[in-house]
Amino acid sequence: MMDVKTTTKLDNAVIDKLIELDESHLNKLNPYGLKKIGDKETYPKLDEIIEKFLEYHRGNVDGVFSWVKELNNLSKDLEGENISYDGNSANNHYGLPTHINGDYKNGLIYHCLFNAGTNGVEDSLKTNNCTLEEYYKIPEKDPKKGPKDINELISKDEELKDKIRNVRKNIIGTVSLLTKELINERNGAERGYYCKKYYQEILKKNTDFYFNPDVSDDDIAKATNNLVNIELYPLRSKNKKGAGYKINKFSLFGAYIILYRIGKYFNDVNSKPNIQKPKFIFRSFTEWEACIIAAIKNYFNFDDDNDKTAELFDYLYDNFFLEFSSPNAGSVSSVNVVKKVRIGNERFDKMTACLSDPQK
């Protein structure tokens, strides 16, 4: 499906190495302090940071809270570079991170973007001119600006444990942004940002399924969680320059997810030859390419072999990767998604069938 002809063939040793990057290996590369209790995944240290964040959000604590500093400290025992940032930008330090949303270990379509926005808050706003509490009150002065959606997320439940869970799932969770916004819309909310900006064609093609009152939210989610959202840079900024981005432990985790999922496909296709191949759609492809290449070099120990690195990346590009037609195109559609040429309606429909009514 949608593959281009390629003369590159992967060595069996490379395929085996991709398969070795299994769930257990991926969990060790998770920078958020993942702890497994049976089959349940927990993030106790991240939850402690979120609880601290909520105290600052309520204005109950003096001092300065910084997401970037908290995340760098959380991941201090993991090899790699810390998250870089642009000085004391309030967006970097106060804005709630968004990184991984969706069933990232089993997804079929991965929407890979650069970072989450700020809803109009300029990167020039500094922490020495604005407290975290004041930052989250920006929507009270201008309803069209600032983190209104995060305030709604925090106020959604009364219990602290529920608030912590909701915030954590915004940072890393198994429910996709398409699912979250679609379920909210089914329950009377306005259409969400990602559905309006990125998923109009998907919604249009699946209206009868998504908005059928006889279909449960859970059944909708089983389909729509096949779409996974990965941000390269977990912190927020209004503009890419305001991020001060460099490859770091968190961006590499996103790249390792991609390598893991491709390895899982190679492992599964041996016994299930007709399974759908995962596809990865990239915006800011230049930055993503550099990060994936860094992950390949790290994992395969290809530091001194650029030819092997390029050969593997080219194979992944030809067989698994898609781009948007321009830097400004972000909508996941038959017009905007390209594999050297636009993929067209038939191929787009085949790729996104996993998001549709399974009864059809």
Predicted regions and their residues:
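Non-catalytic accessory regions outside enzyme or core folds
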Residues: M2-T98, N106, V121-K148, N301-D303, ...
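Hydrophobic/aromatic-lined pockets within catalytic cores
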Residues: G117, Y199, L203-T207, S237, ...
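Hydrophobic/aromatic beta-strand patches that form the interior of the parallel beta-sheet core
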Residues: Y110-C112, V228-I230, I281, L322
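Short, well-ordered beta-to-alpha junction loops that form the rim of enzyme active sites
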Residues: L113-A116, L232, F282-W288
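C-terminal capping/extension of enzyme domains
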Residues: M2-E51, H57, A243-L259, T286-K360
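Hydrophobic, aromatic-enriched interface-forming segments
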Residues: I183-P273, K277-K279
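Adenosine ribonucleotide-centric catalytic and binding domains
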Residues: S84-S216, D304-A310
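Short catalytic/ligand-binding loop motif for oxyanion handling, primarily in non-cytosolic enzymes
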Residues: T118-D123, R236-K241, W288-A294
